[in-house]
């Protein structure tokens, strides 16, 4: 159960500015950001992650290996050039998670999840949903444990 301080914001595209809210949350990170993505072509989000990395935040990204090979993770080179470690999850038919964890072990964790792939189409053309869940420590810990488990079987992008 969430603590009394937990806040949940629901966003629906294309009406709501999901990417703006996601980028704003990323910009407030202080310690670490963990991303798990199926499709990732949003330069706005990639640039926000690179800015966070340059500000000293520990940023790491897991992407679906097959989607990377098919071009569905077109920002991978930019992230790598920005010194953001990228890991390839090829152990599943689809590594279909779409999550961002911000300061997951802190007193003010943020979990971002939903149907929303990190793409321009998800914001402008698709009917998608995004939940931004703040201050729910046990949920953030569960998502972080899951992220860590996927990281264990993922390989670094070369």
Regions inferred by a protein language model and the residue ranges of each:
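Secondary-structure "cap/kink" motif recognition
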Residues: 18-32
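Active-site beta-strand/loop signature of hydrolases that rely on acidic residues for catalysis
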Residues: 33-37, 60-63
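Structural motif
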Residues: 31-34, 110
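PLD/PLD-like phosphodiesterase catalytic module centered on the HKD motif
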Residues: 1-6, 10, 18-19, 44-158
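Short, flexible loop segments at the rims of nucleotide/cofactor-binding pockets, characterized by
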Residues: 9-14, 35-38
């Amino acid at each position: 159960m969430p603590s009394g301080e937990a806040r949940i914001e629901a966003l629906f595209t294309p009406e709501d500015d999901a990417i703006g809210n996601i980028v704003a949350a990323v910009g407030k990170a202080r310690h670490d950001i963990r991303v798990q993505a199926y499709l990732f072509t949003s330069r706005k989000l990639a640039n926000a992650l690179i800015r966070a990395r340059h500000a000293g935040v520990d940023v790491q990204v897991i992407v679906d290996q097959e989607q990377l090979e098919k071009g569905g993770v077109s920002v991978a080179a930019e992230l790598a050039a920005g010194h953001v470690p990228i890991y390839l999850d090829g152990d599943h038919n689809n590594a279909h998670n779409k999550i961002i964890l911000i300061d997951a072990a802190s007193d003010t964790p943020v979990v971002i999840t939903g149907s929303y792939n990190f793409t321009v189409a998800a914001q402008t053309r698709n009917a998608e949903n995004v939940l931004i869940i703040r201050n729910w420590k046990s949920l953030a810990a569960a998502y972080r444990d899951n992220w860590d488990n996927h990281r264990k079987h993922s390989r670094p992008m070369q």
